[in-house]
């Protein structure tokens, strides 16, 4: 079983809202997931506090046990929008 940290799309047409989830890679994008880690709202400006919220401790846990982040989640980490540094 390959576990991925990825975005699951929700919201209305032309008003996307994403959940950051941990899911089996074989499951559909918006299907069943193992754990909800947070959410991402691309309709808000980056400075808004609700633009991207993630449970950092759970993200670190899943990365430590071998879950693979998708391209977009990796981009968030590289840009510093999600911090994986020790507090």
Curated annotation (Swiss-Prot):
Pfam families cross-referenced by the UniProt entry: Ribosomal_S16
Keyword Protein transport listed: no
Superkingdom: Bacteria
Keywords: Ribonucleoprotein, Ribosomal protein
Gene Ontology biological process: translation
GO CC annotation: cytoplasm; small ribosomal subunit
InterPro entries, alphabetized: Ribosomal_bS16 (IPR000307), Ribosomal_bS16_CS (IPR020592), Ribosomal_bS16_dom_sf (IPR023803)
Alphabetical list of PROSITE patterns matching this protein: RIBOSOMAL_S16
GO molecular function: structural constituent of ribosome
Keyword Metal-binding carried by entry: no
Xref: PANTHER family: 30S RIBOSOMAL PROTEIN S16, SMALL RIBOSOMAL SUBUNIT PROTEIN BS16M
Family per similarity comment: Belongs to the bacterial ribosomal protein bS16 family.
Record NCBIfam families: S16 (TIGR00002)
Listed name of the protein: Small ribosomal subunit protein bS16
Species this chain originates from: Ehrlichia ruminantium (strain Gardel)
Gene: rpsP
């Amino acid at each position: 079983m390959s576990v991925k940290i990825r975005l699951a799309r929700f919201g209305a047409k032309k008003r996307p809202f994403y959940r950051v989830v941990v899911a089996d890679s074989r499951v559909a994008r918006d299907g069943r997931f193992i754990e909800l880690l947070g959410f991402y709202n691309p309709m808000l400006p980056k400075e808004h506090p609700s633009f991207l919220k993630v449970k950092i401790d759970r993200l670190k846990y899943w990365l430590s046990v071998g879950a693979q982040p998708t391209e977009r989640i990796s981009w968030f980490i590289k840009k510093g929008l999600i911090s994986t540094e020790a507090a």
